[in-house]
Amino acid sequence: MSLTLTRAARTVRCVLVALTVVLVAGGAVQAQGLKVGILHIGSMADGGYNQAHAEGVQAMKRNLPGVELIEVENVPEGADAERVMENMIKQGATVIVAASFGYLEPALRVAAKYPDVKFFHPGGYKRAPNLTTYWASTPEAFYLMGMAAGKTTRTNKLGYVVALPISFFLANVNAFELGARSVNPKAETRVVFIGTFLDPAKEAAAANALLDQGVDVLGVIVDSPITVVQTAEKRNAYSVGYHSLGAQKFAPKGWIGGIAFTWGNLYTRFARQVMDGTFKSENILGGLADDYLTLAPFGPSVPADVVALVSAKKQEFMAGTSQVFTGPLKDNRGVERVKAGAVFPLTDLGKMDWLVEGVIGQPR
């Protein structure tokens, strides 16, 4: 090789190295300059809904060093939520996670005022050009927990303390009962709706009322599972947690298992979309196969053969070879809701206004 060619090759290598440094540095500058604001309806240490979102953005921060977080907890819905979001934007936030169902309308209003800011809302049913909605489909996980509960119960009476009789929660209770009956045809699930997402006094009263009826496994669909699982523990009953992996420590002896949201990878994806300019408004629905949701570790009361049984069914769900709501299915009034051979799709859960045969209680 001639001296001229050697010098030329070195020059090209230097240019490529310099370009690589610029590109890497450019990505680092973007990460360093990104501010993400997240507002929570409750405490970030509630062992449930809010803690799951808080853990999600912390995982995002670990995945993307340099991203700055602005977190505010215990933000009421309505005007207060709007004010907090606007304050975050004034502090430089270009990403807002409005982490409560009731924040949707406030987020839409603020999004209209700040079109260059990207908003993300869990469970929303409306979007905007700069607002994405997302959620994790939970019936498969509830079915699996129903299987574990159906194998664990001594009385064949299971119970659920539920915030409100909305379709997605009814679907979860139905899935739980179907899972329980798949391994224990005598299992029944009694449900109490308390009318709110967080009220420890009402949660304890509902839990005790169910336990007084002979229920020996309690599940919960409210923001924080702590009160219900602790009430079960105090009365030597079993429990199934929801929302966060951190719930088990509050009732270790009676713990069967739980369902936990794992938002870290999704929040990392959102931040990267904003950083690289690929954001687009969309509605995202994932589940066990998408790593938005996981099963918490099983408790000591669950035998190895039950863990294996549940794990095998989980693999079927993830492979798409099994469906939760496969007919024939009747509601608890005896009306056929899903014909034999048909499947009620998970994408239509918003239309589920009934409780399946075996559930004691009414949605209205």
Predicted feature locations:
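A residue-level marker of the well-folded mature domains of exported/periplasmic proteins
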Residues: A31-R364
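Bacterial N-terminal signal peptides that target proteins for export
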Residues: S2-L16
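Initiator methionine at the very start of the polypeptide chain
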Residues: M1-S2, A31
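Bacterial N-terminal signal peptides
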Residues: R13-G27
